[in-house]
Design a protein with these regions (language model features):
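Non-catalytic, surface beta->alpha helical segment in thiol-disulfide oxidoreductase systems
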Residues: 52-89
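A generic structural motif
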Residues: 15-20, 33-34, 390-397
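Short, internal strand/loop/helix patches
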Residues: 26-55
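Conserved helix-turn-beta segment immediately C-terminal to the redox Cys motif
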Residues: 2-24
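Surface-exposed, flexible loop/turn segments at secondary-structure boundaries
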Residues: 23, 59, 232
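Long, low-complexity intrinsically disordered regions
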Residues: 83-111
Length: 456
């Protein structure tokens, strides 16, 4: 349909034709093959055909697709296309093809990416090359091409060179761009990036003490608890297998945090990371609280976040341990079971120096809901019921060398300090099980939980 029109236009005025996919089209009029789509990109062509009028090197008008009236007006040929339909919509330009647009943006715009580019030879397997360079957590990572990084950066309104934090242990400036690169490698979608940024803001604080979390020989790493309506918007899992595999957002947000600390901050196992055993959560340990199903106010609200805001809370924790109680029929009975299990955090005879997360499941949470227990009430009871006479805790008591100093024999001590239990709610709807995540040393000698609002 177009070629006869081009012949008529070329006969009446100066005409330059650019063709995208077929260099032999049109046969009747000379054409320039826009093989790299540079012309199409720079002229913002989103539909073909597009007809543009140019005067003194400046565009004066354009029309796209086929509109008989518009083509007649732009060419001054009043009878152009009289035998053709009045209008046809045209086709999408190759320059807006989703599979090409990111590469074109990199090729033809001033990219904000300033990180060093690493070129791999055609003989190198990119996945093996990244592993050999020490950029992975032992699992394959996604190659962070400029196209992918630009796409990731579109997930935040922050500028690529904004400094988010100083990343331990090497105390390197951590920019949005560096985070985006590692988020790509972890497998994140762009909409996850604000959550990764917020989590890294939190773990890089002196309060959280990421350097210490790495350097300790204990098996701890960042545990990331996400709150707010955004957790549902990005598809995070707070239900069945919330702490396990299978959910992209949960697993890649946590993984991006760990990869960033490794690749930017220098926190690598065998170097600053000195964990005796470590735990699988040091690859990723991230989940959402089930705020809609919870009988309690949310963890985010408890930590000062306004209702409806998105937030992350980071905690230096080990892997989860299961609490089994299938016989308790009252909140009081279940609380006693939870206390008995919490007493074993790190060691039954060590107290106050360690915090813990208690993840209450729906089946267990139902008992508290039926009796109207609040978050504050449950935490208070857990701490009060964890008090133990010092004579049972001192070194040597019960034939166990481990324990507290002898001068505390006559004291009665709680297992946890005030605020030492983070209560959250998640898990599948079936199973009379809850989970405990033991923490590292707390306060000035260790790590305290940190909460940050998730930005845009």
């Amino acid at each position: 349909m177009v070629e006869p029109l081009l012949v008529l236009i070329a006969a009446s005025t100066k005409l330059t034709v650019y063709t995208q996919d077929d260099p032999t089209f049109p046969e009747s009029v000379p054409a320039i093959h826009d093989s790299d789509l540079a012309i199409s990109w720079h002229h913002s062509i989103d539909t073909v055909p597009t007809l543009i009028t140019v005067v003194n090197g400046q565009e004066t008008d354009r029309t796209f697709g086929w509109s008989r009236a518009d083509w007649q007006r732009l060419t001054g040929l009043d009878d152009l296309g009289e035998d053709l339909p009045v209008m046809r919509p045209g086709c999408g330009s190759m320059s807006v093809d989703p599979d090409r647009v990111d590469a074109l943006r990199v090729a033809f715009t001033d990219t904000p990416i300033i990180s060093r580019h690493v070129e791999l030879s055609s003989a190198e397997d990119e996945f093996e090359a990244m592993y050999a360079r020490g950029w992975t957590d032992g699992l394959p990572v996604i190659p962070p091409t400029p196209e992918r990084v630009l796409r990731m950066l579109a997930g935040t309104t922050r500028a690529p060179q904004d400094v988010v934090a100083i990343a331990p242990p090497d105390l390197v400036e951590l920019t949005v761009e560096k985070i985006a690169i590692n988020a790509v490698m972890a497998g994140c979608l762009p909409e996850y990036l604000p959550w990764v940024i917020a989590a890294l803001e939190a773990v890089c604080t002196d309060t959280f003490n990421m350097h210490g979390v790495l350097a300790t020989t204990m098996p701890v790493g960042p545990v990331i608890i996400c709150n707010g309506p955004g957790t549902r918007a990005i598809g995070m899992n707070s239900g069945i297998n919330a702490l396990g595999q299978g959910n992209r957002a949960n697993n890649t947000i946590g993984r991006a945090v760990q990869l960033t600390i490794r690749n930017v901050g220098g926190g690598r196992p065998g170097e600053v990371d000195r964990a005796t055993h470590g735990n699988p959560g040091k690859i990723s340990f991230c989940f959402a609280e089930d705020e809609l199903g919870s009988p309690f106010t949310s963890l985010g609200t408890e930590r000062g976040i306004a209702l409806g805001q998105n937030a992350v809370t980071v905690f230096a924790g080990e892997g989860p341990r299961c609490v089994v109680d299938q016989l308790a029929r009252t909140a009081d009975e279940l609380t006693n079971s939870l206390v008995a299990c919490l007493q074993t955090v790190h060691h039954p005879k060590l107290v106050i120096g360690f915090d813990a997360i208690l993840i209450v499941s729906p089946d267990h949470g139902r008992l508290f809901a039926q009796e109207g227990w609040t978050r504050e009430q449950l935490i208070t009871q857990l701490i009060e019921r964890s008090h133990t006479p010092g004579e049972q805790l001192v070194r040597g008591a019960r034939g166990i060398a481990e324990g507290i100093p002898p001068h505390l024999r006559d004291a009665t001590l709680p297992k946890f300090r005030p605020g030492g239990i983070l209560l959250t709610y998640a898990g599948g709807g079936a199973g009379l099980f809850s989970s405990i995540v033991a923490g590292w040393a707390n306060s000035a000698i260790g790590s305290d939980p940190v909460t940050r609002v998730v930005g845009s």
